[in-house]
């Protein structure tokens, strides 16, 4: 029984002395008594390599490198005694989750959180922590019974104790955790002859749990010799840099005292690791209360960067410089980090520099396509085939990889199901998934070519293939009752999917392509999945569960699966966290992310037991628990010390001034402290360094080209750049091995987001030799020429979704109002409440099922919306009744179409216009409502357009003038051209151009007491007052509102009279008849100019900004035109918004410009 400890600061040769001692014994007696080297899990591989790579040893039969768990396994193999099944991490969490579900009603604090997966994970961590520190359910129960505890803490401890006790009961004699197996290992250690003959060395630890101290004590009792290596100066001061390892030393002394033996201490005071004074000064002066600054020899460097990405780019450049100029191997270099955000940056940046690396961290399998497929499959069953879960399943492409162009087929299928809102067992309806239904995609029926028919047949075939697999899986799972049945059915389903053979084929293809890491991932995913199924059977076996319970427990298991990737090559950069990485004796260490808040890190408790509760439990239950946050905070300096003393030659510290989310970051106070250790150590600003020495950025051809792009862009913008960048460009351009991709970069330098004007032939191919178009198409061109080109030239369409759009609502109102108007022949004024209700119900029952494949009957929300639509229609009809009672104008036509060649007598004729190129313009459309009033040989017409949006229910004459609002003038022109078809007199004149807002008004009152019924009705009707422009002819005004008299303000149309009977210009919207004709003529001119521009091939990205609003705000093509609001303001067109359109039109008329012959 010999107990030793090696004590010394970092770099004093403790580990080297131990290894040399072991090697000498192996050389003297290769088959002698066993030597056991116990190290942390992450260090075992490196230590094994130390023996394998030794030229004199070439491995070892006598020495074994183990961590505590593997040591216990080795002893159990020798003496037996472990009969229970060891639970994996996933199995433990699945068992705890199931216990929580069973006892949900018994939990006082965590009952409401029982369904959350995270709770079982936290409970597993807490129970494992208790086991490491030898805390049992009895300890917790005694604490609760014998002490007065705060209610919340009491309920928490009662819940944890209940779950802990149930877990112990469930495992009793059948299962065992890692911590329990270590407890048993301690008990049977005395039976091991192997241990009795062994010399044990323990290295790489800075602290131990209570359980590990008990193992060390048992080893000291039964092994020939135990030696523990500690990085400490032996100081026991509570605020010492070495507080943590010194605490370990105190525990070792306690063990020696209990065993009544001496703890032999060997002190190491000479530094061997550091090859220069910089590193010696760094080690010696860090965290010292008194230090003497030394002159800097350039072996310790600090640089700051503007961003984290630029920081890692600089590290990559410096690594290449190390390898190229200092003759380092990649394996001589390590990168240490603390902020998890850096892990992604390493994986995205280092490969672009061709730097091999290995990150010593486990990565979740959650986002692997196979795992995504499995979890989607579970969600499909859980959600009763919800559309989102089904599409996720398809998009993994795991079940559809046998189809050519499967991704494209899935995209087409997605378009279809999103349009139809497929859910539940509608996925099985073959009438929905038919060629005929696919031909109606986009709300219009299309004649399919043979090629399209074949394509959609393949889509249907792909859909059926996946649906059959899902049906098989669902049926198999529904027939199961026990966990063993479920697991068996699950595996059989995977075989039915032919997944095992598919994955083997993929793995072989990846290995042939040299993608060994990706191939290894497939192996690990499959093995992990099988392990979860095995764990389920092991833990639950024939226990009955509902399908939902099984899927929940299974999902918990999948959550725990992680990739453990072994290094793919021996010569690679080691990357790890500062807390865990084992990277001793590297030539160059890069410590990145040295920012305040990261090092030192603000430590907070993330366990179920808070720091205050830990202290309470320790004080009253007389146990020791894991360190609290304040203790861990004290050890932050030690974390930094251990990380920076791993190097033999150089250490480079770096930090960024800005985080990934754009937040400002500060330098770590540790770096400020390190800087003070040297007289002339300066922090290098990368921006200044690269400006002065641009060659430092040119370490790799690919990245140099990317940087070159930035500098050449500045050069083209007449910025001053270093001539060496131009030299680099010429060198790369003239080198066939380096210039790949350079043309693409240089082309993008001169790229301007400009479209090309189409030639005459291409314009006619896109638009035809005749322009057949609606008014809105011309308005769209005026808003932005590119918008017109994208929608009508390229014919780009947004994906149609199974949801109600704004234009759907407008279409519904138009259809319902037309139906009712036709039924009553436009006689709104004679409607009564009963008629209004019955007609509305009748119209909705007929029209709503036709909207978006019966969308409005698909959910409770849409059924409520249907009722709301009905209420709005009824309100609108009441307003129309009121307006009809006080107007001489009579509704004559509803939803009246017009075109060059009418299809029937009900449609109107639209006379073609001619572009400047001589191309006919055939305008077509539909007028919502035409009202007429005839007196003698004069007829007057109103154009009324229904709008469901208040913002669009306004006639803006400035917009009319500039061609942004062409609808009303066009409609009036068409009606005036068709007096015969409308049955009007020979003399037809414009009455009003009016918008009617279809809505349900909301009247605001300060309080219930302020409500006056008469005033309420007046305000209600005023909300339906039509807006627009009226002919100021007194005959027209009198007919529009028969109540017109002095001091009267109409609540029907925009007209008001003064006390003297004159038109109130402020409250009225009127114009002379000739002005209206002039507006119509000007509108025609806008049509001709717009159509001529279209046929000239204009496609500019040139949105027209009006009243500080851009059409881009509501445009569907922003992702195509790439217009940028910050940098493309020069593209915006504007108009003079201060003009008075009616005055301008009058001026044109006076100058003899545009004229109109009314008849």
Swiss-Prot record:
Domain spans labelled UvrD-like helicase ATP-binding = 1-275
Keywords in alphabetical order: 4Fe-4S, ATP-binding, DNA damage, DNA repair, DNA-binding, Exonuclease, Helicase, Hydrolase, Iron, Iron-sulfur, Metal-binding, Nuclease, Nucleotide-binding
EC number(s) on file? 3.1.-.-
Residues binding [4Fe-4S] cluster, per UniProt:
784, 1112, 1115, 1121
One Gene Ontology MF term: double-stranded DNA binding
Which Pfam family, giving just one, matches this sequence? Answer: PDDEXK_1
Q: Which residues form a coiled coil?
A: none
Q: Which InterPro entries match?
A: ADDB_N, DNA_helicase_suAddB, DNA_helicase_UvrD-like_C, P-loop_NTPase, PDDEXK-like_dom_sf, PDDEXK_AddAB-type
Question: Where along the chain is ATP bound?
Answer: 8-15
Q: Which metal ions or organic cofactors does this protein require, according to UniProt?
A: Mg(2+); [4Fe-4S] cluster
| Residue stretches making up the UvrD-like helicase C-terminal domain | 269-583
At the top of the EC hierarchy, this enzyme's class is hydrolase
Co-factor: note: Binds 1 [4Fe-4S] cluster.
Q: Biological process (GO) annotations? A: double-strand break repair via homologous recombination
* Family per similarity comment: Belongs to the helicase family. AddB/RexB type 1 subfamily.
Q: How does it assemble?
A: Heterodimer of AddA and AddB.
- What this chain does, per the record? The heterodimer acts as both an ATP-dependent DNA helicase and an ATP-dependent, dual-direction single-stranded exonuclease. Recognizes the chi site generating a DNA molecule suitable for the initiation of homologous recombination. The AddB subunit has 5' -> 3' nuclease activity but not helicase activity.
Give the free-text miscellaneous remark of the entry: Despite having conserved helicase domains, this subunit does not have helicase activity.
UniProt cross-references to PANTHER family, sorted A to Z = RECBCD ENZYME SUBUNIT RECC
Q: What is this protein called?
A: ATP-dependent helicase/deoxyribonuclease subunit B
Q: Which organism is it from?
A: Staphylococcus epidermidis (strain ATCC 35984 / DSM 28319 / BCRC 17069 / CCUG 31568 / BM 3577 / RP62A)
Q: Which gene encodes it?
A: addB
């Amino acid at each position: 029984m010999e107990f030793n400890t090696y004590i010394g600061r970092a770099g004093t040769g403790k580990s080297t002395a131990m290894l040399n001692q072991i090697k000498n014994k192996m050389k003297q007696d290769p088959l002698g008594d066993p030597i056991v080297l116990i190290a942390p899990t992450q260090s075992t591989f490196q230590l094994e390599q130390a023996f394998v790579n030794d030229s004199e040893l070439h491995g070892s039969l006598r020495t074994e490198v183990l961590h505590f768990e593997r040591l216990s396994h080795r002893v159990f193999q020798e003496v037996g005694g472990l009969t229970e099944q060891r639970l994996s991490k996933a199995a433990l969490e699945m068992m705890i989750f199931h216990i929580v579900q069973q006892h949900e009603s018994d939990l006082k604090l965590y009952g409401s959180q029982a369904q959350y997966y995270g709770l079982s994970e936290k409970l597993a961590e807490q129970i494992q922590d208790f086991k490491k520190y030898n805390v049992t359910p009895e300890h917790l129960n005694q604490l609760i019974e014998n002490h007065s505890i705060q209610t919340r803490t009491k309920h928490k401890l009662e819940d944890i104790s209940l779950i802990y006790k149930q877990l112990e009961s469930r495992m009793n004699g059948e299962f065992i955790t890692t911590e329990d197996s270590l407890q048993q290992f301690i008990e049977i250690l005395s039976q091991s002859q192997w241990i009795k003959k062994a010399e044990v060395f323990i290295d790489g630890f800075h602290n131990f749990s209570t359980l590990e101290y008990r193992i060390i004590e048992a080893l000291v009792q039964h092994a020939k010799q135990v030696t523990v290596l500690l990085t400490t100066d032996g100081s026991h001061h509570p605020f010492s840099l070495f507080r943590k390892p010194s605490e370990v030393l105190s525990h070792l002394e306690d063990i020696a005292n209990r065993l009544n033996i001496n703890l032999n201490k060997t002190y190491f005071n000479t530094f061997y690791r550091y090859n220069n004074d910089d590193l010696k000064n760094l080690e010696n002066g860090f965290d010292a209360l008194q230090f003497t600054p030394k002159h800097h020899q350039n072996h310790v460097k600090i640089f700051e960067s503007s961003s984290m990405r630029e920081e890692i780019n600089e590290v990559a450049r410096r690594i290449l410089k190390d390898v190229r100029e200092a003759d380092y191997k990649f394996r001589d270099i390590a990168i240490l980090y603390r902020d998890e955000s850096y892990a992604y940056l390493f994986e995205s940046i280092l490969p672009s520099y061709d730097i091999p690396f290995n990150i010593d961290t486990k990565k979740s399998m959650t986002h692997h396509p196979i795992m995504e497929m499995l979890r989607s499959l579970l969600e499909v069953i859980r959600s009763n085939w919800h559309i989102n879960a089904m599409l996720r399943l398809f998009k993994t492409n795991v079940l559809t990889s046998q189809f050519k162009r499967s991704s494209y087929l899935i995209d087409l299928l997605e378009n279809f199901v999103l349009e139809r809102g497929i859910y539940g067992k509608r996925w099985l309806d073959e009438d929905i998934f038919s060629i005929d239904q696919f031909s109606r995609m986009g709300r219009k029926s299309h004649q399919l070519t043979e090629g399209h028919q074949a394509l959609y047949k393949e889509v249907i075939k792909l859909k059926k293939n996946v649906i059959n697999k899902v049906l098989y899986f669902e049926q198999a799972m529904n027939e199961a009752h026990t966990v063993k049945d479920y697991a068996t059915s699950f595996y059989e389903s995977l075989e039915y999917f032919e997944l095992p053979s598919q994955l083997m084929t993929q793995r072989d293809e990846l290995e042939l392509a040299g993608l060994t890491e990706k191939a290894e991932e497939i192996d690990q995913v499959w093995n992990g999945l099988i392990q979860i199924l095995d764990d389920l059977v092991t833990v639950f076996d024939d226990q009955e569960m509902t399908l939902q319970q099984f899927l929940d427990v299974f999902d918990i298991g999948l959550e725990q699966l992680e990739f453990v990737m072994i290094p793919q090559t021996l010569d690679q950069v080691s990357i790890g966290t500062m807390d865990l990485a084992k990277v001793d004796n590297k030539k160059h260490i890069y410590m990145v992310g040295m920012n305040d808040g990261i090092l030192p890190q603000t430590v907070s408790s993330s366990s179920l037991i808070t720091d205050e509760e830990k202290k309470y439990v320790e004080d009253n239950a007389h146990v020791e628990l894991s360190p609290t946050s304040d203790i861990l905070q004290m050890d932050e300096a030690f974390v930094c010390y251990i990380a920076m003393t791993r190097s033999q030659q150089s250490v480079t510290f770096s930090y960024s001034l800005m985080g990934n989310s754009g937040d400002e970051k500060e330098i770590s106070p540790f770096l400020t402290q390190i800087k003070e250790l040297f007289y002339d150590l300066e922090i290098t600003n990368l921006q200044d360094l690269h400006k002065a020495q641009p060659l430092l950025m040119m370490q790799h051809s690919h990245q140099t080209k990317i940087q070159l792009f930035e500098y050449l862009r500045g050069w083209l913008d007449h910025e001053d750049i270093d001539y060496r960048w131009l030299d680099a460009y010429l060198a790369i351009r003239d080198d066939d091995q380096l210039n790949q991709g350079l043309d693409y970069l240089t082309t993008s330098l001169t790229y301007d987001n400009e479209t090309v004007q189409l030639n005459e032939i291409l314009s006619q191919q896109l638009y035809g030799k005749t322009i057949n178009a609606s008014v809105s198409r011309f308005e769209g061109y005026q808003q932005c020429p590119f918008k017109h080109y994208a929608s009508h030239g390229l014919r780009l369409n947004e994906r149609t979704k199974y949801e109600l759009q704004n234009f759907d609502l407008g279409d519904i109102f138009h259809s319902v109002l037309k139906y009712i108007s036709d039924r009553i022949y436009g006689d709104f004024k004679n409607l009564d409440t009963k008629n209004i209700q019955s007609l509305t119900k009748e119209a909705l029952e007929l029209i709503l099922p036709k909207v978006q494949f019966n969308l409005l009957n698909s959910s409770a929300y849409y059924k409520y919306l249907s009722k709301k639509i009905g209420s709005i229609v009824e309100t609108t009809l009441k307003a129309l009744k009121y307006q009809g009672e006080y107007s001489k104008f009579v509704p004559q036509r509803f939803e009246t179409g017009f075109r060059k060649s009418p299809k029937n007598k009900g449609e109107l004729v639209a006379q073609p216009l001619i572009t400047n190129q001589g191309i006919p313009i055939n305008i077509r459309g539909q007028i919502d409502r035409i009202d007429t009033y005839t007196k003698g040989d004069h007829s007057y017409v109103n154009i009324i357009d229904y709008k469901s949006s208040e913002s669009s229910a306004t006639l803006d004459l400035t917009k009319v003038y500039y061609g942004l609002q062409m609808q009303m003038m066009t409609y009036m022109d068409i009606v005036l051209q068709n007096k015969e078809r409308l049955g009007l007199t020979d003399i037809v004149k414009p009455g009003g151009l009016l918008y009617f807002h279809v809505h349900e008004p909301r009247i605001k009152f300060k309080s219930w007491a302020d409500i006056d019924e008469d005033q309420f009705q007046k305000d209600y009707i005023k909300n339906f007052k039509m807006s627009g422009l009226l002919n100021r002819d007194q005959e027209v005004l009198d007919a529009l509102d028969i109540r017109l008299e002095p001091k009267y303000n109409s609540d029907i149309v925009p007209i008001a009279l003064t006390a003297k009977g004159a038109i109130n210009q402020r409250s009225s919207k009127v114009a002379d008849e000739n002005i209206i004709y002039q507006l119509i003529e000007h509108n025609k001119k806008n049509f001709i100019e717009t159509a001529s521009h279209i046929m000239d091939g204009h496609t500019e990205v040139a949105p027209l900004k009006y009243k500080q609003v851009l059409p881009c705000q509501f445009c569907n093509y922003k992702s195509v035109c790439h217009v940028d609001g910050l940098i493309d303001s020069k593209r915006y067109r504007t108009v003079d918004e201060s003009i008075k359109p009616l005055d301008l039109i009058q001026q044109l008329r006076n100058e003899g410009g545009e004229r109109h012959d009314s008849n």
